[in-house]
């Protein structure tokens, strides 16, 4: 799936290089180059270079793309010239023999001619822009001296280190524009004056310093610029994103361009070289110059840049990203072999003002205070090399994706898949730099009979496809897709030991065949640390709770022999599971049923037309289709299998029926990935959460693109908003279509809504679809973030099939007790072979009074009502728009249905709950002379229910207005009048987030671990906090993350930091969301990235704690020093 979007990229992607000859020893004409630091500008080209041959009179372009007039000159033969005067820039150019290599960039929002603008921008420390700012200052200080209003310190020489001037003189320089940058640090003013156009006779020639001073980048050289670098600038601002032309997005992420476009220019992504970074703490993400000693990146790897210019690497084989250069992995040394000042591969040194100096192991995701090199050498001297924190580094260096670099003997074999599989288990592949190895060879299996495969063999090649670096799930799926009685050709390498037993992450049996009260079912079963799980087999314990069934028949029992293959399922409740073969005939509109993802496989979600699927029941799990095993296939792959059969074909289905029902709807699991057996497959499916902990089982489906998973999880697979319910609506197409219109999708963040319901159309006859419902899925394809045209294309595709399955989200405005949302308990009525919800489904609740009001006005009058809009974003479920005034004698007054205080949820069938006030006013104006308002009566509209009828008895948040909602003519808050000549503006009411905090403790008694509570209770008692970055960050540090098997908690609060000043953040509070992304299951590093990605603001959703921080077993990380206060 691809879509067109406007990309924003770093200016490095616009850098151009060319080779120029000036046509004589005098060098370039001074008029060809303008700008210079004395004018407060970068050097830039004033004219276009003519193309010509070398040796011809005048300047000539010999190779590369000619820079355009106005392009900024960054480098000459690899030497940065930014910050030099015009005279010194020409001197550097003339110093080199012809031809010379120029590096230029087209001016943009971040880097342009204005040197003062670039120096005023804030960049992340360590980024290429931050580095370039330091280079500019170093070049400036060759000709100028920074000034300050503080007194000289011991050892400082006036006129050498700083010019020490009074405050009045400093402000005079600032007002005259003589300072390139200015600001305050530690209560004193600092500034960098413009250098003079002509140097004094006592100043040395800067060319030698710029070109050959190896100590130019040392700490001693920069000591005097520390205050200037860290000062609070007067005109500081964040950089704007550079906009690029429209490009095709890949997998919806828009992140990667087609490399074929750059086949002639392999260096197109390389940054400007020689902004030298010394052998300091940032070795693991060094800015790479044209280092010819480095070989090309491995196959399907790509080097890319963050928005701030940081280099990272994309592995398209595993669809993962890393800071670590894969080419340096082969050159990695053991820690004890590293020299002083050198760090092992994958390590980073952090100098933190609060925690001091510590070291981060990015490979093993650990932190420690001791230098890993000194630690390894110390332990080597003491003879205690075991257990060192970098023990895995030598092992990592053995990994390679190049088969020619493998150590050991290559073994080639061909195995025939039996009903028992291939007869061996595999281990590894949990990380991109980990081999997949044979764990066990099962007795009497094809591998044992072949005799050539042994434990420890590394899987190199499967049917001609190199799998070095592939994930565990990818390789398992490749084996599972081989039909029974077919051969697979394999290449293995013998010579690598198996990892220790305590490091075995996951073992997959590609072969074992469980017996479930019937014939064998071939499936790649999954086990964790020698405990095998039959995917989807769920039993009940004595308390009636669900849990995974181990192959030895015990729940969560001790480990078992991995060679165990045959089991029988013992159930303490529910019907006995059975395998049933059902013959089906494909009708003109498909097989007549819809399927959905479930923990046990693809299950029958809905019977649409029983005449074509007689014998099939809702809840049946599909195991085989026409004798083809489909247990390991994704949702869309099963749909494709069903689609390939022609109309009238007889297709036998092997299904699993009975046994204890697995949870079908929980707080964390929604069967949204639905599709009819004959629907069009349009996007990738997302695996649904399992009813037992996700760490206990690995998915057999290939790993999805992280950006795709993230985008989709932000649409409908995250916790759905409270006070909403999701509905599945199946419609059959009539001659006039499906009978409804679609609104929205005008922008990337604009939701899609159901518009008008066409009278006598399919939607109205069905009765379940309503105007203003938010459209979530079309035939299982999420539509959030899609454009209006893309949604129409999906509907057109559905129309060709004659039917559509819609998933819509509807807001609920409570008037009493909460309505039960379990879809499975709702009655289903079938009319004309179409499922239909019972119209009495709301009979048990006090429904709020929601009605439509149609107003008609004359040419010379308005509608006669005033809409007030909440100034602050209210809590979910609260409509922010209400009637503030009804004008006497107006159409609104004459209709008698509008009252002051009534909430307006839709205009002309379009939901306005999420719209701004100005958008609503414009919507009413565009309606012309007739407008239809969807009204929620004032006395019926209440906040979210508390669970009881008394707010005082409930610990749930209560929303109460903090200020009056009366009108005020003097206010400039949002509000408008419709139907009057003048514009009357009113104070909009405000709703507060609850002041008191309620801690919702997780239910530890449920074996499933997921879905034991209703989705609305997940964030119960949580409160949002928005913090603005201060001079040293957001003022808090974190503890926890997935790698520590714990959630994320507030560890410390910095004194006088933004978090302390806010007053709501306390030590021990749990972080539930960061900038809208749930923190469940994310790593410590990912949490830091989310905080940094927010720029100058961060939005946290916190759950109040007890003041105590949960401990974990990793002592070196107990202080979580990786989280730097200055960064968040």
From Swiss-Prot:
Subcellular location: Cell membrane; Cell junction, Tight junction
Binding locations of ATP: 123-130
Comp. bias (Acidic residues): 238-247
UniProt superkingdom: Eukaryota
GO CC, one annotated term: cytoplasm
Domain PDZ: 22-108, 412-494, 581-657, 728-810, 852-939, 1024-1106
Protein name (database record): Membrane-associated guanylate kinase, WW and PDZ domain-containing protein 3
Classification lineage: Eukaryota, Metazoa, Chordata, Craniata, Vertebrata
Gene transcribed to yield this protein: MAGI3
